[in-house]
From Swiss-Prot:
Record field: catalytic activity: (L-glutamyl)(n+1)-gamma-L-glutamyl-L-glutamyl-[protein] + H2O = (L-glutamyl)(n)-gamma-L-glutamyl-L-glutamyl-[protein] + L-glutamate
A matching Pfam family: Peptidase_M14
One GO CC term, this protein: cytosol
Record localization: Cytoplasm, Cytosol
Protein residues bound to Zn(2+): H368, E371, H464
The keyword Protease appears for this protein: yes
Enzyme class: hydrolase
Transcription regulation found in the keyword field: no
Protein name per its UniProtKB record: Cytosolic carboxypeptidase 3
Outcome (variant: E540A): Abolishes deglutamylase activity
PROSITE patterns listed in its UniProt record: PEPTIDASE_M14
Domain of life: Eukaryota
Record organism: Mus musculus (Mouse)
EC number: 3.4.17.-
Length: 1006
């Protein structure tokens, strides 16, 4: 797991006794009067005398190359017997010799946040350049070095020139210093007797990320109100506007009262100033403060400092402990650009054999150097997992922990807020292949990849700090579809929910987010999730405090942050507990949350719930792997408006209304004043249908133009169902041939049913529809009047005139979308017609054989036949909707009565050939069956519906007595729907009549 040594290495001898020789080599490297290459590996020399190896170093001394062996690589980094590895700085950085140390201290009571009074002032210093500069981190000699485009090399102690002393004009001027580890302060200007303008240094080799400050103040005077104003912040929003106070440390207070870092300040204000340059805007932070002691050495900081030296001291203590060192192995993962060590810890109970059943847990921290709160959480985690409690032992026995406590030591040392010495954010480069530029994240990813080949990694968590939100929360990953993997969708939220239950006063589950943004694809969280780690999280800890429970309105201290490490271990035990009661309890709560919020839709996308939208918006790259949102409910409204604005805008409301009006006008031109039949379930007021098992039956009656001898007859067995309101509607019937156009029938709103029983002309027919109950035998008669319609040729011409996709009112052509909408509506109307049409059966007794021939011949029937066949449609519900073709003629199942002898004499097998083209229609949704059946087999309206198998073939059978005649085309025996036997009179035919029923049935393919 240590770094490869194939490249040129200056730092392997950094902890050896010949450290001075190493420093001299660097001085020779930058000197102009000697050879530019003073130290090379043997494999870079073309002389065959030297073997190709990386273990021999060549030094240029006295005009010749002198070989020597490379020192052994330091795999352990820390040692209980030897000194710690010294920190290495960029060669141009000035570093004071004094080592800064602080004590740890916990306030007796939680420190409250600052409550604005409204009297805070916003100081502006337009003429600060003319005032006295009391501190400047870089002078003219170092300006060129700071403007280097990239990092060059490093050395222990940084710049070796004499340090420039701070300005000390008079006795009452404060003395500032920040040239120590993790310090950050670039310039201080004294604008008044007790007022100072401060400028923090941006990250090295960048011109941004001015957020972290940490500096020293001496020559203080007690009982004097000082004002400090930092003028070059770049974030528009800050926790200082929400009550966060700066941190203060007094050495005298630490010595006399054992008090460490504490929150201080009055008149705290974060505001926009007028120092914008090149289109950039800056923000100022101002506060006032009275020092507790005179001639004191004090410190101000953005958050509790935790330096690289603090980490080394902590790891050295672990290594020197005979108990903890047994189950905690410290190794060097790699070296940074400045040749500082990146440590990796392996924590587990020693394995007697190679046990691959243990799952792995990975924790990393401090990829952003200014987020020091992540190091305090890591310290709390290590304190607990290395302790002697029973839960800690159980965790070590169950898991293998891989811990990288500080991913960016270079940035921590120089006081950066976000970047490494490469000038880049490491948490956006986990996908990079540049091992030399981003070694810590490259080797971390490689280590995890190799670990996953041996064992399962159950959880990955990267610790961060957040500068705009309160509390502690998590970011997770959820790139899968909820509808397909709902279980996984909820399982990724179980661990954060458990964490919120174990520490409800500091962890907020409502602030957690579980989405993958494109701008975050280079983060460790997303990369590890894509590598196969299901529980991949970023733990975000606020710089301020909590808004939850009894911690509400208070700042987080170091102990609060350390306690988060303990709660993390406790939640890990709950998550992997063999007793899955807590697991399923959290899963059930998540399901209830989803059900509760699923009804609240914030956009037209029905798959997006409110909780998903609130978890979708994350911040830009200026913050941590975090969000710009806050914890208030107004954020949901803001996000809701953002989600609605994401919808692509197509047309204005006026345009949409115009399109809808045009479609309605065209439909009215086609159908006249008619309307579609309402469904019976829509007209049911109470919604209780006692006929739940009975199918719906609709009876359609055909009428003709009134003749002199036409009379009115009653139809037995038809009555309205009680409690229902039935309506009649005009229906459209297509002819049997493409040459005949649509016949559109007028609407009848009269609920009384009457049937014209004698000569009926099909060209002037009108369908009347009524719904019949099937569970009770009818006992009365219902009359139905005939309503004439328009002539066939008039309706045909009207349909032709309105078939164009051009608006007659606007005179504009329709778009493709409008045409598609219009066609869809026409198809839907045709489906309604085919669904509700159900003709009745009339008696065909005493009919001539010529009439049967006319019925079989569709063209002749349309022109000559004077008796319309009453058709029966088997109304069936299909699971898959079907769409009729535009020009397919409508056909109905028909039951025709005729004498058996007449049928056999007048219907040859060749007559069926006229129907064969109907069977050969390709890609049609309807097929036909033709068969004959004796009238004695036809029962009354008490029969049940039977399913008819789908078939693309036409079968014809003639039933006579017990014999069945079938043509060769017969391929299957279709089950038949028994239709009520209806005649013009109330007389039921006897079984001796021997009438044959001719049936033509439509089959629809789903």
């Amino acid at each position: 797991m240590s770094e490869d040594s194939e490249e040129e290495d200056y730092s392997d001898r950094s902890i050896s006794d010949d450290d001075d020789l190493d420093e001299d080599s660097f001085m020779k490297f930058v000197s102009d009067d000697i050879h530019p290459c003073t130290l090379l590996a043997a494999d870079s020399i073309g002389d065959p005398f030297f073997p190709r190896t990386t273990q021999i170093l060549l030094e240029y001394q006295l005009g010749r190359w002198v070989p020597r062996l490379r020192g052994p690589r330091d795999l352990y980094g820390v040692s209980s017997s030897g000194p710690l590895s010294p920190t290495r700085w960029p060669y141009h950085c000035e570093v004071i010799d004094e080592k800064v140390q602080h004590i740890e201290w916990t306030p007796f009571v939680p420190e409250p946040v600052y409550v604005p009074t409204g009297l805070e002032i916003e100081p502006v210093y337009p003429n600060s350049k003319e005032d006295t500069v009391v501190y400047l981190a870089e002078d003219d000699h170092l300006c060129k070095a700071y403007k280097e485009p990239c990092f060059v090399y490093s050395r222990v102690g940084g710049n070796r020139t004499s340090l420039k002393q701070p300005v000390d004009n008079c006795d009452n001027t404060l003395v500032f210093e920040a040239r120590f580890e993790s310090g950050n302060l670039q310039k201080v200007v004294k604008v008044a007797d007790h007022e100072y303008e401060l400028t923090v240094r941006p990250d090295l080799f960048t011109n941004k990320h001015t957020q972290w400050y940490y500096f020293q103040v001496t020559n203080t005077q007690a009982e004097i109100v000082y004002r400090f104003t930092i003028v070059n912040f770049t974030k528009p929003a800050s926790l200082y506007n929400r009550g966060m106070k700066p941190l203060f440390y007094s050495e005298k207070e630490a010595k006399t009262h054992n008090i460490g870092w504490q929150r201080i300040g009055d008149q705290i204000k974060y505001y926009k100033n007028n120092l914008g340059q090149d289109g950039r805007h800056f923000f100022s932070l101002t506060w006032t403060f009275q020092f507790p002691h005179s001639q004191d050495t004090c410190y101000f900081a953005h958050c509790y400092p935790y330096t690289y030296s603090n980490l080394q001291e902590y790891l050295s203590g672990i290594n020197s402990d005979p108990v903890r060192s047994k189950f905690c192995k410290i190794r060097v993962l790699c070296h940074t650009l400045a040749r500082n060590m990146v440590y990796v810890l392996t924590i587990t109970t020693p394995l007697k054999t190679s046990d691959s059943k243990r799952k792995a847990v990975i924790l990393t921290a401090r990829v952003h150097p200014g987020e020091t709160n992540s190091s305090w959480i890591m310290k709390g985690f290590l304190d607990y997992i290395l302790g002697d409690s029973s839960d800690a032992r159980l965790l070590r026995d169950t898991f293998i922990f891989k811990v990288v406590p500080m991913l960016n030591p270079d940035g921590v040392i120089v006081g950066n807020y976000r970047c490494s010495l490469a000038g880049r954010d490491l948490n956006r480069n986990y996908t990079s292949l540049l091992k030399e530029s981003f070694p810590s994240v490259w080797y971390t990813r490689n280590m995890i990849n190799r670990l996953m080949e041996k064992r399962e990694v159950i959880l990955y968590c990267d610790l961060h700090g957040h500068s705009r939100k309160q509390n502690i929360f998590m970011y997770g990953c959820d790139g899968s579809s909820r509808s397909k993997t709902k279980g996984l969708y909820l399982q990724q939220r179980i661990f954060p929910l458990m964490l919120s239950k174990n520490c409800p006063n500091i962890f907020s589950f409502s602030a957690c987010k579980f989405n993958v943004q494109k701008s975050k694809e280079g983060t460790g969280r997303v990369v590890m999730w894509k590598m196969g780690i299901r529980n991949s999280f970023t733990l975000e800890a606020t710089f301020c405090g909590s808004t939850l429970g009894n911690k509400r309105g208070t700042h987080f201290g170091t102990k609060d942050l350390e306690s988060m490490g303990y709660h993390f271990c406790d939640s890990l035990l709950d998550y992997c507990d063999p007793d899955r009661s807590k697991y399923y309890q959290c899963l059930k709560e998540l399901e209830e949350m989803e059900k509760h919020l699923s009804s609240e839709r914030v956009s037209d996308n029905t798959d997006t719930s409110l909780v998903e939208i609130s978890l979708d918006v994350e911040s830009s790259s200026r913050g941590s792997d975090s969000s710009e949102s806050n914890d208030t409910q107004t954020y949901l409204l803001k996000v809701t408006s953002q989600a609605r604005n994401k919808k692509k805008y197509l047309k204005t409301k006026r345009e949409r209304n115009a399109i809808l009006a045009n479609c309605q006008n065209n439909m009215q031109e086609v159908y006249g004043k008619e309307h579609l039949l309402q469904r019976h379930d829509e007209s049911n007021s109470d919604g209780n249908d006692p006929r739940i098992d009975a199918p719906d039956v609709y009876v359609a009656h055909c009428f003709r133009r009134p003749l002199p001898n036409q009379g009115v007859v009653k139809i037995p067995g038809q009555r309205f169902y009680p409690g229902k309101t039935w309506s009649s509607s005009q229906r459209m019937i297509k002819s049997l041939n493409k040459d005949h156009r649509t016949c559109i029938l007028e609407t009848c709103k009269n609920p009384i049913q009457e049937v014209q029983s004698r000569g009926i002309n099909i060209h002037e027919s009108c369908f009347k529809m009524a719904k019949c109950p099937m569970n009770k035998r009818p006992s009365h008669w219902i009359e139905k009047t005939r309503i004439p319609t328009e002539s066939h040729h008039q309706l045909k011409s009207k349909a032709k005139r309105c078939s164009s996709f051009q608006s007659k009112r606007t005179g504009t052509n329709w778009t493709d979308d409008e045409k598609r909408i219009y066609r869809d509506k026409r198809i839907a109307q045709t489906q309604e017609i085919l669904k509700y049409l159900l003709p009745i059966v009339e008696s065909s007794q005493n009919r001539k054989s010529t009439q049967m021939n006319n019925l079989i011949n569709p063209i002749a029937n349309l022109q000559q036949h004077q008796l319309i066949p009453t058709a029966c449609i088997n109304r069936r519900r299909y699971s898959i909707p079907w769409t009729p073709t535009r020009n397919l003629p409508f056909k109905a199942q028909r039951n025709l009565m005729t004498d058996t002898s007449e049928w056999l004499q007048s219907v040859p097998l060749g007559s069926f050939e006229s129907l064969l083209p109907l069977c050969n229609l390709q890609k049609k949704t309807k097929h036909f069956e033709l068969w004959g059946k004796k009238a004695k087999d036809v029962q009354l309206a008490t029969s049940q519906w039977e399913a008819v198998p789908l078939s693309s073939n036409m079968d014809a059978s003639i039933i006579r007595g017990n014999s069945v005649l079938q043509p060769k085309e017969f391929t299957m025996r279709s089950s038949k729907q028994r239709i009520p036997y209806l005649t013009k009179t109330s007389k039921k035919p006897s079984e001796s009549d021997g009438l044959l029923t001719f049936q033509l049935k439509i089959h629809r393919n789903s």
